[in-house]
Amino acid sequence: MRYRPVIGLEIHVQLSTKTKAFCSCPADVFELPPNTAICPVCTGQPGALPVPNEEMIRFAVKTALALNCKIHKYSRFDRKNYFYPDLPKGYQISQYFYPIATEGFLEIDGDEGRKKVRIRRLHLEEDAGKLVHEGDSITRASYSLVDMNRCGVPLIEIVTEPDISSPREARVFMEKLRSIVRYLGVSTGDMEKGALRCDANISVVDTETGRQSNRVEVKNMNSFRFVEKALEYEFERIVKAMERGEDVERETRGWDMTTKTTVSMRGKEEESDYRYFPEPDIPPVVLSDEYLEEVKKELPELPDEKAKRFMREYDLPEYDAKVLTSSKELAEFFEECVKVVNRPKDLSNWIMTEVLRELNERNIEITESKLTPQHFADLFKLMDEGKISIKIAKEIFPEVFETGKMPSQIVEEKGLVQISDEKLIEELVKKAMEQNPKAVQDYKSGKKKAAGFFVGYVMRETKGKANPELTNRIIQKLLEGE
């Protein structure tokens, strides 16, 4: 490929602390009425002094450890100065000169196999407020309203090196990061609610000439799919400009969900534009060896480690293990099921197909469903005893999922118990053979597919309730013995 994208990400993770970064206002403000979770500190009133949230610092250290970062025992807060309607103080408290962590990495399944994406820095900062645009998009809004509730909500910003080689890899990185912060319990990672936000920097290299375009920042991508789509669009836009011999402007562009395009928002700021200087009202953060060791002991088993254990303990293929461990809740559900039904591979197949289909259709997590390990114990027992076929099991599963009823109850109510009476099935097959000698002859002349005719006959006569395995065995026995 002549043109190659070079992508780096700047990711904001909203931390699930009880209170905001520097005051006692609640941090969970998503569903609160506008401007109801604010105080003199988070709105920057004169004389109000910030007090750092220890839980925020602990969450940042946990995340940095999970991302293989170098933790700095000494870090400091700084003021990032800029004007925007949702920033009442006129500056944002962040970490610029001495971040809490640097030099990490996250392994992902890249386009050409396993790869490490380096993490340049991880630092703490407070969130700004939120502009609510009245119109179908930011570019066509007739006016905007300001909600200050989000001011002061604690964030960690994670900045990667430009190691990402495609829009797909950017999406995969984001999905993996969300999985990790959820495992750690430091964030919900919900992009739709703004708990995980991504700005991407993309440039394009012409591999034939070595020429590289200016870097463009892309914002307003509030789902994993939009991260990939926005970067695909921007890559194509930059390539077309380069092919025309045009210079690509260094700017910030926003993803427009309506038009599926990126639109210019403003020129790209330089870091010097923010006039960073040390925050005079907050002392440095100093971490002891004992504190770091204590936090390290709190780390849970993370997705990659859990996937390796699933492969080792349950003899699962790598793909199954990765899917099951992509969600902490799904992995826990699987292990609870294994305790009740010790058939890991069968359970994995059901969870990865039927369960995930139902969850995705409803856009919910496994913890929000009515499904329990006991449902699988009941379902597998029905199949093992020959009372229902796997076909019937899959047909009733959506109702099991929706209602929480036990499979045996649904089977009983709907009269779906499988017929496993050998004598009855044998009589039906013999009757079909007597009435259809041509099908018998076809089978004997080598057309083995003719057996399907007799299967269909038995299923019609029993309204689909005949045990398919038993039916096939009897048909083969009678046809071979003719």
Swiss-Prot record:
Molecular-function annotations in GO: asparaginyl-tRNA synthase (glutamine-hydrolyzing) activity; ATP binding; glutaminyl-tRNA synthase (glutamine-hydrolyzing) activity
The name under which this protein is listed is Aspartyl/glutamyl-tRNA(Asn/Gln) amidotransferase subunit B
Top enzyme class: ligase
Annotated coiled-coil positions are: none
Which Gene Ontology terms describe the biological processes this protein takes part in?
A: glutaminyl-tRNAGln biosynthesis via transamidation; translation
Tell me what reaction this enzyme catalyses: L-glutamyl-tRNA(Gln) + L-glutamine + ATP + H2O = L-glutaminyl-tRNA(Gln) + L-glutamate + ADP + phosphate + H(+); L-aspartyl-tRNA(Asn) + L-glutamine + ATP + H2O = L-asparaginyl-tRNA(Asn) + L-glutamate + ADP + phosphate + 2 H(+)
Claim: Protein biosynthesis is one of the keywords in the record: yes
How is the quaternary structure described? Heterotrimer of A, B and C subunits.
Keywords, A to Z, come to: ATP-binding, Ligase, Nucleotide-binding, Protein biosynthesis
Q: What does this protein do?
A: Allows the formation of correctly charged Asn-tRNA(Asn) or Gln-tRNA(Gln) through the transamidation of misacylated Asp-tRNA(Asn) or Glu-tRNA(Gln) in organisms which lack either or both of asparaginyl-tRNA or glutaminyl-tRNA synthetases. The reaction takes place in the presence of glutamine and ATP through an activated phospho-Asp-tRNA(Asn) or phospho-Glu-tRNA(Gln).
**Biological classification of the source:** Bacteria, Thermotogati, Thermotogota, Thermotogae, Thermotogales
